[in-house]
């Protein structure tokens, strides 16, 4: 239409109405600009399309301030027109939206939806509006271009019942198409994750935040710096929420959360379910906060495996913030340990094998991200499906639909890094755009052509090439991607598939090169940036293929599914029980979920319109179905067909990848949009500029979008053909009320009507059967009254909503995108108060509003389970099986002791404070505590014995003999002591304080070391009260008249200085108390002790007529008193009074000391008839006047015993070490053993070791200088696990080392394992072959424990002990001829038939660890030792460290390893009882040499060592900590007549822990295992020796030394202190003896020229406190550090224990067993029945029942292969030198060699050659009656074997030749022929 009159050009809203010269991109852009600048941001593409520009301001304001012409008004107008067509024509209406991110597409879509819902203002329309809000809340985000970016494909369907021209809304349906899942874990810079996560964080109350764990302070580690800081949650950086600034971008998150909860409530979600939804959202946020680090799994578990380097615990990834982990576990209803275990491991399917990968920190983080993504995906699906269940109408009641299709905008790059999301969304846009082009160009042209109407052709960009290349079924790009995913192909293979498909075949897709050549290199390498390019309608996009195939798999690991099975949360269980989660079950066990996949397509499909009325069918009857060729119909979700398709297995287990599912969903959309009765509208949303500036129009930016969408071409097309309605002539004439009187055909009548209407030719044309009209023309004739007014008159009669500027999403300016003013992504749907928006009118659903307001006003989790209750519930184990087990009497006695020692610790305290919920764990803790108490008591007793006990026997005496006193003479470094009246004082300390000061110290020092009693005369009357209480002051007593000490060091009474201390009564200066006062002062400050007299010396003095005796251990001397020492003196000038009694001592006392001189008179003293007063006075006189010293008992027997007890202990210890020293010296030089012919098995258990370690171990075993034919290398792989740092599972690494091709894939077979419940049923695979390394060709067998199909995490893993038991139990059953499991039968078959050795021939088993390297001569030396001593059952060699210098931790262990072997084990070897032969390097005797009686595999050993119920502390320490030591214990226990020895000539090197934590854990295990095993050994009666020379004494000594090891450090420290404080020779001697220990050790390594051990010894001595103090204390306290598994004991009735397990109950009958003879007979039958034409017999497998080489890399050990059963990679030239038969012959060399297993060496040739040169096939058979006798057969067999080639002859061939010779069928004699052949070949006949 041209612009009329003075109407401005910009007022023309319809672009096709512009003149033809204005139809270019530039002119259309200019026209849009002119409208944009007058606030008209919209334009029309006639009636078929709408163009909206984002103004970044209000979307509701047009040029006149109202909504007309605005981004809100035009969609309303479009909705009214579509509504009119829906009501009047009963057509389905569909709207397709196009636009880049930031173009306002989501906003326009919301206005359109709101308009339709406003036409039906019912509670249902309100719910549908809320449903759209919930969808957007879950799937929209803020990007750099808009605050409301849709990140999920939406197909929103409104359902109507067309009962009248005003259709009734009866339902709705939300179909979500794969939201951008990668955004959950990878939020792009400057963008946000999905809005609901921010809503939750901002909108919850304080109580709710507390429940959800979103409050409080946390430590944040800054990326890159590693620095931690404390921050509150409001500023906390949430990994899944992007940068913290994204929480403050103008969006009202808090209000959004309230709207979200309100919407769910109005959608009838229960309150508890909304709370659960919030908990899952919180759990997702917390998963993002999990921090992973590398730690050591030091808790001991039964499944542990590996060598010495693993014994301290394997390196695992751990969660550092356990509190956050606990929150996640609580909300998911899981146990914390289970969740952590699931995050650190991931099970994948590699080459049809399930393999568990031990993840590093990066892998664990990705695994956690996968969990979060899966949770959010399932939550979104669950909420949408729940909404659909509430609002969707029944399919058969739906007459018409209105569909809104909106996919995320086209993207030329992926902001989150997900190429798959980018590819699928762009493919969806491509498909939708192609539908648009088809609808406007092709569909119209087809209709016109069918009616023979011609219109001018219009050129346009056809994207069909891109659509076909991307979306074509079978060989489109998405189909190829999905096919490659299902086939398990790599990215490079996918790229090559694209190249074959598209190169030079589709110009829209270009495939890049998979290889690239680096500059300066001539060699092509893998192109890490390989990509393919798609030419989209919007431009070319490069898609990198890296990880695209894996991402398309979209696999949810089986570990996660297995973990969720145990959830206690019904809601979480429902999430994972949805149909959207496609599970893949194991083909062999349907209950085992191997993996799963979250569907990328909606659970529902677009509704199929039901044509219930004739009016609805009128158009369909006349319009041809021109829809595309039908594809394979997609089954309806939920139907049986869908389920069958969903579970169809493929190479990877997946039925469809994300691409195929998305493609299927796109097909459904395309079918829906192109259905015959659907009218399509297309809305093109454009952004005016790239900088989000309001009211700014960038012509270049807009022109690019106009070109991209082809708007100019569409407009030109509509200028020539704007036809959307076809009316048959009758219907057209009826609508126009044409004059019935006009004569002519309907066509002529219609032509007259058209002529009268003057409609332009591009809007009205006549065809053969009807009239083509535009929508405008149709409306002018079909609509009347209010409908016409509404259609043409804008707002007339419109129920649309008035303008609400307060809640407009465009109301912001430059900085805002299309979003809401208040930041709520839902509020652009209108103001809730005004109705018509998401939340509708307030008067609707008032009850729901009330409920919702009450719901969000406080705490939504009120009256629900608390976080702690959820955690306890999640950690609680499910009990499945109950078993009653008896309690032994010894166990009862021990528990009685335990409770006696720990009764004061209440059970509830252990339960709540210690966190031990399980009764058996608490019991173990009590046992541990009781054992620690006993150990501490033992240590205390040792300390008491060493330190306290000697003091009790001989208390320390501070006495000095005369000689000792004289030594303290102050000369040199000697101290200065002096004696006064039996008391010794420190003269050196006193001299500075002597008064007066003028006396020089040199004068005082001359008294040092002497008895200075003579210097101090005493006043008798002041110191003694005499017989009657008083002594005359004139009485004097001369004390110094006699030298009683027997030395010259006595000061006489003539000393010049005596006068200065003489203050007696007769002097001028009488001070009676002066001496007493001075003695009090000296005793208080300077006393050192007393003069000591031995009893012997007292007797000696008595013999010299001295009146000296001992009273109460004090020595008194009456010699002076008796020999005239008494006198009477008065002061000068006074007369001596007469009658003075000088006998102041009672005569009885004097007589006692005179008559009993030299003796102890204590008992006589006590017997004296003295009254108490007199006795007291006599005692006072004795102490003050006659005391000369105390009894010196230091040399008494009692004190000598106490004195030498330390020396005795040292001598005892040194004697043991001395014995060890001589034991170490008793070995002679190395002897070169002879060549040996014994068969040896070398077993290597493998777990998660790296390839280098495994190769070193396997190569060292293969290179041992021992006859290769008599060695069998058996590797047992413990589970399908990829260790950290490995790129393949351990079994694959082992098989690659041994040269086994990946094509060899034997069937897994059942066998018994050590495990709880159903874990006892395990499955394994057997491989065998020959391994060549450095000239050695060694037969090998690999047993891979793969686990049952139901095992998801770490399948097959049961631990190292179980790996040992696989071989031990097999040999046990071989030797006892017991029924075997399928795996054991296969092992027997491989060894006997393939390798060619009877398993009973093997006599010894060498066990080495996978991280151990053995010396070449080790096996030879060990076997030699066995042959020299037939009573030897176990031999170990010397193990050294191969990583000695890795760290200080390993350096500490070098010397300890050396002496533990060369001293300890050598010493125990003297007794023939090495208590621990280490499992890393030990050889065992399998059977007795003479009798063949099983030893190592005897019944008792197997029974005890295979104990499954390991539920007590003692049993766990025995079987889980040190299985090798316990195995040695069992050997000594049950085979007491046999010996275990140590041979230092056999060497091996192992890897020791190099980190402190692992070292501590390893030694904890060793120490505790040692204690518990020695406790087992001590009661044994069979240990050799007598008394202290018995092994029991050595065992007890070892146990004691282990228990009291901490005291040894204290003992040495005590000796050092004694040596430093005393010069006594005893501690010095003891210390010298202990020092000699290391001297003896030094002699050993000097004699052996181990000079480097000097340095290692120093390091070891420095580390002594660690080994002897730190490690034992740590070990004893951590004795109960175990992984307690899922089986626990509780106390039942009558003293029994009830065994509770959640692992199920194992039935032994579930594993079939049969004897070898039965199995052998089956083999023979299978061989006989085989087709004669078969040229080669391969191993007949128990598992496969086929002739395929089960597990063997060669086709059988007894055929005529020239290459001796080598792996395919082996060349013949390598073997032709010595074609050693393995072991049945040399192939083409025709050597007559008998097999070591004659019964099975016979192979099968299709034509056994006879002496005559003819073959069996040439012989004719005739029927004869009667059979030949056995003798006749025997003779003929001998004749045949004499001339036949034994390398190719078979039993069957012999039977055939016999039948030829006797001309009779010999099936009846088959058994005899076989046994006779065996007997002849073995020499028995």
From Swiss-Prot:
It is found in: Cell membrane; Membrane. One of its GO terms (biological process) is fungal-type cell wall organization. InterPro entries: Chitin_synth, Cyt_B5-like_heme/steroid-bd, Cyt_B5-like_heme/steroid_sf, DEK_C, Kinesin_motor_dom_sf, Myosin_head_motor_dom-like, MYSc_Myo17, Nucleotide-diphossugar_trans. ATP binds at residues 99-106. It comes from the Eukaryota. It is an enzyme of class 2 (transferase). Induction: The expression level increases quickly and almost doubles when cells were shifted to 37 degrees Celsius, compared to cells maintained at 25 degrees Celsius. Expression is also increased under additional stress conditions that are known to initiate development of the sclerotic morphology (acidic conditions or Ca(2+) limitation induced by EGTA) or of hyphae (induced by nitrogen limitation). At least one negative regulator binding sequence exists in the promoter between -880 and -680 bp and another regulatory binding site is localized between bp -680 and -450 bp. Residues 666-690 are annotated as: Actin-binding. Its main location: membrane. GO terms for cellular component: cell septum; myosin complex; plasma membrane. Maximal activity requires trypsin activation, suggesting a zymogenic nature. Glycans are attached at residues 219, 429, 668, 1043, 1068, 1462, 1568, 1759, 1790. One of its GO terms (molecular function) is cytoskeletal motor activity. The keyword Metal-binding does not apply. Residues 957-1016 form the Cytochrome b5 heme-binding domain. Gene3D superfamilies: 1.10.10.820, 1.20.58.530, Cytochrome b5-like heme/steroid binding domain (3.10.120.10), Homeodomain-like (1.10.10.60), Kinesin motor domain (3.40.850.10), Myosin VI head, motor domain, U50 subdomain (1.20.120.720), Spore Coat Polysaccharide Biosynthesis Protein SpsA, Chain A (3.90.550.10). Polymerizes chitin, a structural polymer of the cell wall and septum, by transferring the sugar moiety of UDP-GlcNAc to the non-reducing end of the growing chitin polymer. CHS5 is required for the sustained growth at 37 degrees Celsius and is of critical importance for virulence. Especially important at infection temperatures for maintaining the cell wall integrity of developing yeast buds, elongating tips of hyphae, and random sites of expansion in sclerotic forms. Contains an N-terminal myosin motor-like domain with a P-loop (MMD) that is involved in the actin-dependent localization to the regions of cell wall growth. This is Chitin synthase 5. It comes from Exophiala dermatitidis (Black yeast-like fungus). The lineage of its organism: Eukaryota, Fungi, Dikarya, Ascomycota, Pezizomycotina.
